């Protein structure tokens, strides 16, 4: 057999090279909170409008009375095996934090860590092209970045956006009486677990990629709506974790209506069969003491509510009279599953699910 006809080594599955994937590989919220407590607090800068105080989605720094910079970074290990899709999902997820602050992205830098001697260069290039395609869709350049040779594949972006200082939307400004609206269906972590176990069919994969590559573009328009008080996105800490951040920031109780939650097709069946991520359990261990689950919820409820979302939906807290405008804003951009899922009420800083 000549060298030209020798069988080439099989390219490993991207997900086989990482111990976690997507936002499910975040440091557990309880551990992260403890680490941040030990960090040196930043000096007080009057123009730093948003820092680390409430675990918000991005930093915001005021340049002048008309402009503020939104700065964020997000990267993770593969949630899918297709390199182009991996790049698209990671980039969409990174840009989401800019939208979640009410901002508009203007620039991105690529963050790349790859096992250079394990993956073919064309595979790595496909990851980069995937990220670039999403940034092109968002109307921004990937203007540079940084790369390292790493044991596990890692990809993401540092993203810069702009926002008017008066339109910055924090995760700590919800008010009693506000209605909670969620932009995307839940269950990405469950589908990713099914994929890793070779249990996800083509339709399931297609819906997972479709939701995780849909840019949360309505964020800037939502921030401009009267009556929108708080905004965040649902990612690695699951719906309960990010709703709890709203509750803690506002010192209110968030009520979530389980029957109103939108789910990706098949996720409830997968969880009933024992298919879900380890991050779900870590999330519950971190914040479950501040959650009340009503009697009578399905047995799968806890795992689904703590399911880590990668490139998840925007979560809006708005006045009741703004709900129709919020839903219209989502649906105008193709978010057909956007739904009212609960409300904020006076009470201790926790989440009640009924």
UniProtKB/Swiss-Prot annotation:
Its cofactor is Mg(2+). The active site is at 23. The record marks 26 as: Important for catalytic activity. ATP binds at residues 26, 54-56, 74, 97, 145-147. Its EC number is 2.7.9.3. Gene3D superfamilies: PurM-like C-terminal domain, PurM-like, N-terminal domain. It comes from the Bacteria. InterPro entries: PurM-like_C_dom (IPR010918), PurM-like_C_sf (IPR036676), PurM-like_N (IPR016188), PurM-like_N_sf (IPR036921), SelD_I (IPR023061), SPS/SelD (IPR004536). It catalyses: hydrogenselenide + ATP + H2O = selenophosphate + AMP + phosphate + 2 H(+). GO terms for molecular function: ATP binding; magnesium ion binding; selenide, water dikinase activity. The keyword Transferase applies. Binds 1 Mg(2+) ion per monomer. CDD domains: SelD. It is an enzyme of class 2 (transferase). Keywords: ATP-binding, Kinase, Magnesium, Metal-binding, Nucleotide-binding, Selenium, Transferase. One of its GO terms (cellular component) is cytoplasm. GO terms for biological process: selenocysteine biosynthetic process. Mg(2+) binds at residues 57, 97, 233. It holds the Pfam family AIRS_C. Synthesizes selenophosphate from selenide and ATP. Belongs to the selenophosphate synthase 1 family. Class I subfamily. NCBIfam families: PRK00943.1, selD. Homodimer. This is Selenide, water dikinase. It comes from Burkholderia orbicola (strain MC0-3). The lineage of its organism: Bacteria, Pseudomonadati, Pseudomonadota, Betaproteobacteria, Burkholderiales. The gene is selD.
